[in-house]
A protein has these predicted regions:
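Short beta-strand/loop segment that forms part of the nucleotide-sugar
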Residues: 181-192, 218
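A conserved hydrophobic helix/loop-capping motif in glycosyltransferases and polysaccharide synthases
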Residues: 151-159
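Active-site-proximal specificity loops/subdomain of glycosyltransferases
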Residues: 194-252
Length: 448
């Protein structure tokens, strides 16, 4: 969970010897024979998928940008009656060479059929499954509500190659839900690979699309001083991305859904499934599952807790991830639902992509706050304390932190549409039996 400077929750535990910068994947050296029998069976029943485009980018070798100091953004006066500017603080000009290269990225973001830049292949969503998410007028046309009710928040750093897929999928989702019903808020920080320039140039496209777009940059670095203040700084960055929502609550529909998405490669169907399950399950929060090591290892074990109060897999005092393949080892019910790709309740999650109700934010009851256990963990704790404890993981939605990683993840864990194949909206087995009582104890892991 990188936030404007590093948006992925790096595990700082000294005993863990890996990093997320794993060896690049060679797509053509994986075969279906390497997959588990149950996954193989699903693959055999699924339509054939095209091979991914060879991964490359015209900005693969970043051009050195001048050492400009990013504008953190000055504290603004609270105003709940009038909208804030989509550029709340003066933005730097950006690197001219990177600005010249940005139109290719903008074109890819705005056009899902653009093939100039490679990206993760994404299937077209099944409209019948998600049609109920689109507000409709009496004549059947997409209805434009008076106030936005979908708020997309991101903290991004140094990820220009990911933007065609990540932002492109968000744009597709906003078009589906109705652009005027959506708000996009991005906090960027310290990028010199073209991320800043592309996101800045996105303003005119969002204006034409009639999406309210808030973009700002920050000089906050969660890893400054060896990451000693990483958690409070990450919390601050997340709150910056939510500022347009929490500072102007009257501008938003009371039933607004917030999508907070990390620097992951995901598809439109992934985002829509998180929303679909939030609506269908009447959940307060839904999360994907994020993976590393070619989709073999669940990543966000630091933040996520089961309804047993434990991590998704056991990490002993040595800090070793030796048991990472043994998910939900002490929770048979959750393990069964995960293996069946059915939604299951958890005490906390984040997992690369999440959707949650904006109600406690609009009421000023909840915000991200610092704690050594991780700011999303305490965000979920605050949701529970205010009566928003219907938190679920949607195991049909699986993501990775690059196009290559997500391709490997979706080969092993499957695409969302493959995981829900044959499932109907009336399938009672998929419904969660919610537990509303708080847990007595939650495992605390302060040593990450």
């Amino acid at each position: 969970m990188l936030a404007a400077v590093i948006v992925v929750a790096f595990s700082l535990l000294p005993y863990i010897s890996y990093s997320r910068d794993v060896t690049p994947i060679t797509w053509d050296d994986r075969t279906r024979d390497s997959l588990a029998p149950i996954v193989q069976d699903k693959l055999d029943k699924s339509p054939a998928r095209p091979s991914p485009v060879e991964y490359k980018t015209s900005l693969q070798t970043p051009i050195n940008a001048p050492p400009d100091v990013f504008n953190h953004g000055k504290k603004k006066n609270k105003d709940t009656d009038s909208p804030k500017s989509s550029s709340p603080s003066p933005l730097r000009a950006g690197n001219s060479a990177l600005l010249d290269a940005s139109p290719r990225y903008i074109a890819a973001i705005m056009d899902p059929g653009d093939t100039f830049l490679p990206r993760l292949f994404c299937p077209a969503p099944t409209s019948e499954r998600y049609d109920h998410l689109r507000p409709r007028a009496a004549d059947g046309s997409v209805n434009l509500i008076q106030k936005p009710n979908y708020f997309f928040a991101l903290n991004l750093h140094q990820c220009v190659g990911l933007l065609p897929r990540l932002i492109g999928s968000i744009v597709e989702t906003m078009r589906f839900l109705g652009p005027q019903n959506c708000v996009l808020s991005i906090i960027e920080g310290r990028s010199d690979d073209g991320t800043y320039e592309v996101l800045k140039q996105l303003h005119s496209e969002m204006e034409q699309l009639r999406v309210k777009y808030y973009f700002d940059s920050s000089e906050i670095d969660p890893m400054v001083g060896n990451g000693e203040r990483r958690i409070p700084l990450l919390a601050e960055l997340r709150n910056l991305a939510l500022r347009p929502l929490v500072e102007s609550p009257r501008l938003y529909d009371p039933d607004t859904t917030v999508f907070f998405i990390n620097d992951v490669s995901l598809c439109m169907e992934d985002i829509l499934e998180l929303l679909h399950q939030r609506v269908r399950q009447r959940a307060d929060m839904t999360c994907a599952m994020d993976w590393i090591f070619e989709g073999t290892t669940f990543y966000d074990v630091w933040i996520s807790r089961t309804m047993q109060g434990d991590q998704f897999f056991e990490i002993p005092q040595s800090g070793a991830w030796d048991f990472s393949k043994n998910l939900f080892w002490n929770d048979p019910k959750t393990r069964t639902r995960h293996e069946a790709r059915l939604p299951f309740q958890v005490w906390s999650c984040w997992n690369g992509a999440t959707s949650f109700t904006a109600k406690p934010l609009l009421k000023g009851k909840v915000r991200f706050r610092s704690n050594y256990s991780g700011e999303p963990t305490h965000f979920c704790k605050d949701l529970w304390n205010h009566g928003y404890g219907k938190i679920a993981v949607i195991p049909s939605v699986n993501v990775g932190y690059s196009d290559e990683e997500s391709w490997a993840v979706k080969k092993l864990q499957l695409y969302t549409s493959e995981n829900v194949l044959g499932e109907s909206n009336g399938d009672l087995l998929a419904m969660i039996d919610w537990q509303t009582e708080q847990l007595g104890q939650i495992k605390c892991v302060p040593t990450y």
